[in-house]
A protein has these predicted regions:
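Extracellular "complement/coagulation-type" protease architecture
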Residues: 2-7, 11-298
Length: 298
């Protein structure tokens, strides 16, 4: 396919900064396809092609469930192995973070995962066998680290992909849930390829999942003696005895309730410590920001 004035467009897009919600396109990834998607979606707000957009038949779903600085970096302990078909919305961002597919061409992850990685990996239970997809642009929430002084407030980052990830049983977007579902005792699932214990220095090759109850703000603050300083963009999940938790390498990964995305792995004190549950970024709370960046009909 030929793109007229593609060199001009690539130069223009590599320098443009529309506002503080995103960073420049990673160097080395400025293909004509990437520039086309960037111009169409970000600059002109034209509706992208069907395969790039958010359609309800694409959305994944699980059946309802019945049941120092380094300490706060990255973020499955006490879980079990699963297949990617059980969490087809899960992707790997770079080497040490997770992410969630919210549309064939969009991934949601944590802002603290930074913007150095140029690829996401999807479609495989095995981390080492996942297919590579280039990132066009990173959009970090403009209030991250500037609003409340909390180092993990507004811990959100959107990734625009160069090409849409094909929708299959192993890679499928997930819908965003309701803020009303973030209730004390609701059981959520957390998935990832992260460490099995703090400072294990080994990512897992096979995807894992753990189930944990949400802990409301009042109980979480009591449990942690107020050390977490929670905001409305955060919620806690875990057990008082610390047997199950997310850990290093899980950051940015999905927290799911009844088949819909509620949160992202954000931070915590080490992993699976008693009385120190994990803290997760509240995704429904920033639905409007996600809509404003992606133009998805959320």
């Amino acid at each position: 396919m030929h793109f007229e004035n593609s060199s001009y467009l690539m130069l223009f897009v590599s320098e443009v900064v529309v506002d503080s919600t995103f960073n420049k396109i990673p160097k080395g990834l400025l293909s004509p396809a990437c520039v086309l998607q960037y111009n169409r979606i970000v600059l002109t707000r034209i509706v992208p092609p069907r395969d790039f957009y958010y359609y309800h038949e694409y959305l994944a779903g699980n059946p309802p469930l019945e049941v120092t600085e380094e300490d706060f970096r990255w973020r499955i302990v006490g879980g079990k192995r699963i297949t990617i078909q059980e969490a087809p919305y899960q992707v790997l961002y770079g080497k040490y973070c997770g992410g969630t597919l919210i549309a064939p061409g969009w991934v949601l992850t944590a802002a603290h995962c930074k913007t150095k990685a140029g690829y996401v990996y999807a479609g495989s239970t095995s981390r080492s066998a996942a297919k590579e997809y280039p990132i066009c642009a990173h959009f970090i929430h403009p209030y991250w680290e500037t609003s409340s002084g909390h180092s993990h407030d507004y811990d959100y980052q959107l990734l625009l992909l160069e090409k849409p990830i094909p929708v299959t049983s192993a890679s499928r977007p997930i819908a965003i849930g309701s803020v009303d579902d973030i209730k004390n005792g609701n059981i959520v699932s957390v998935t990832g390829w992260g460490y099995l214990k703090f400072k294990a220095n080994k990512m897992q090759d096979i995807l894992r999942r753990v189930y944990m109850p949400i802990i409301d703000e009042e109980n979480c603050e009591k449990m942690t003696d107020g050390s977490y300083d929670l905001t409305s963009r955060m919620f806690c999940a875990g057990y008082a005895n610390g047997t199950k938790d997310s850990c290093q390498g899980d950051s940015g990964g999905p927290v799911v309730y009844q088949g819909k995305l509620l949160g992202l792995v954000s931070y915590g004190l080490e992993c699976a410590l008693p009385n120190h549950p994990g803290v997760y970024a509240n995704v429904p709370e920033v639905r409007g920001w996600i809509r404003s960046v992606t133009a998805l009909p959320l």
